[in-house]
């Protein structure tokens, strides 16, 4: 049986609208549980301090607890891998640094493609790097 083009377009449009609105309905409930904020460096590092300074205001704004989770190692690759493997539901955030971008060139066999698998949400700081000498 052949479906007329016009009828097919109406069905396709209806299906697309239903899919879009089902995602919207799910998004209206976000967040309904704590959010995990993964940091790729040790406790006390600049990245950790930044995450811990942002977490309270982010928690207040979202109306849910934001848990800072330090996962240091392999230049940020361990933390990135944890986030990439998590559900893409917005409940697992990664504090990314320039190291994350460089890692693709530095390490062979990563289980992820940082550009493809991670989506930027917001810029949270700009930290200059300074070359110094003793005086």
Q: Which positions does each model-derived feature cover?
A:
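Hydrophobic/proline-rich hinge and linker segments of small-molecule sensing/allosteric domains
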Residues: 105, 125-135
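Residue-level detector of conserved, well-ordered beta-strand and adjacent loop positions
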Residues: 69, 122, 134
């Amino acid at each position: 049986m052949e479906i007329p083009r016009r009828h097919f377009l109406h069905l396709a449009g209806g299906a697309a609208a239903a899919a879009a609105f089902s995602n919207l309905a799910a998004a209206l409930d976000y967040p309904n549980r704590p959010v995990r904020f993964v940091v790729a460096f040790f406790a006390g590092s600049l990245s950790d301090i930044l995450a811990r300074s942002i977490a309270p205001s982010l928690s207040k704004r979202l109306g849910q607890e934001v848990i800072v989770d330090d996962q240091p190692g392999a230049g940020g690759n361990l933390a990135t891998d944890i986030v990439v493997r998590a559900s893409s539901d917005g409940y697992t955030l990664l504090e990314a640094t320039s190291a994350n971008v460089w890692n693709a060139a530095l390490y062979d066999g990563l289980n992820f493609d940082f550009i493809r698998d991670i989506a930027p949400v917001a810029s949270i700081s700009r930290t200059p790097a300074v070359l110094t000498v003793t005086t």
